[in-house]
Amino acid sequence: FAEKHGIPCVSTMMGLGSLPSEHPLFYGMVGNNGQKCGNRAMNEADVVLMVGARVADRSISQPDLITENKVLIHIDVDPAEIGKNAGPTIPLVGDIRHVFDEFNAKELKVDYSEWLAWLDKYRAEVNAESEKRLAQGIADRKVRASRDYVDPRLFIRSLSLAMEEDAIYIADVGQNQIWSCANAVIRKGRFM
C-alpha cells in the first residue's frame, strides 16, 4: 500500500521490521526512544494512518500531536484498542489484509513529492548529524577508555550489517533494546 501510493512510513518499536530500515519510504521509529526524523515526520503529517499501534507513551512520544490538526485513521483488529489513548478521526476495525486489499483497490490522487523531498532532505541531515555524533563519541571513548571497549551502538550497527538479510534480531529489555532499535539495520522487512 505504502509503495503503491508513495506514502512515507514510520514505526513504533513493536512494528520495527514492517518495512526494511533502509527502505526509501521508511523514516524511522517514533516514540520517547524514537528517532528524530520518524517523530518529526509523524508530528508534521496532515494524515496519520495507524495500523495496529497502541499509542502508548513509549510508542508515541506526544499522543496529543497525532490528533492535533490532522486526520487520524486507526486500523486494528481489536475494537478495544481503537481510540484507547488517542481519539481517531476515522476508526476502522478489521484484519489489515482485508482493509489494505480494499485500500489498494482505490486510486489515490495525491501528490506527496514535495513532502517526500523535504523528508528525504531532513533524514539525510539527521543521519549525517547522528553519524558525526557516533563517530565523535567513539573517538572520545578511545581516548578515555581501554582498547577493549566497544561502543554498543556501533557494535549493533556493524553486527546487523554483517548478518544475513533475513536475520531475526532479538533484544532483551533495557538500554540494549533502545540501542538495538535505534542502530540495527533491518533488511527485507524482518523482525526486531
Indicate residue ranges for each PLM-predicted region.
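Conserved catalytic alpha/beta core of Sir2/sirtuin-type deacylases, generalized to analogous enzyme cores
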Residues: 5, 99-101, 105, 137-139
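A short acidic, amphipathic alpha-helical/loop segment
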Residues: 1, 60-63, 158
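Glycine-rich, acidic loop regions that bind phosphate or pyrophosphate groups
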Residues: 15-125
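Anionic-ligand anchoring segments at beta-strand to alpha-helix junctions in alpha/beta enzyme folds, i.e.
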Residues: 1-45, 161-192
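Short, exposed beta-strand "edge-strand" segments with a Pro/Gly-rich flavor and a Y/T-containing core
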Residues: 6, 76, 88-94, 143-150
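Generic hydrophobic/packing signal
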Residues: 7-8, 50, 60-61, 70, ...
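Active-site diphosphate/adenylate-binding microenvironment
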Residues: 123-192
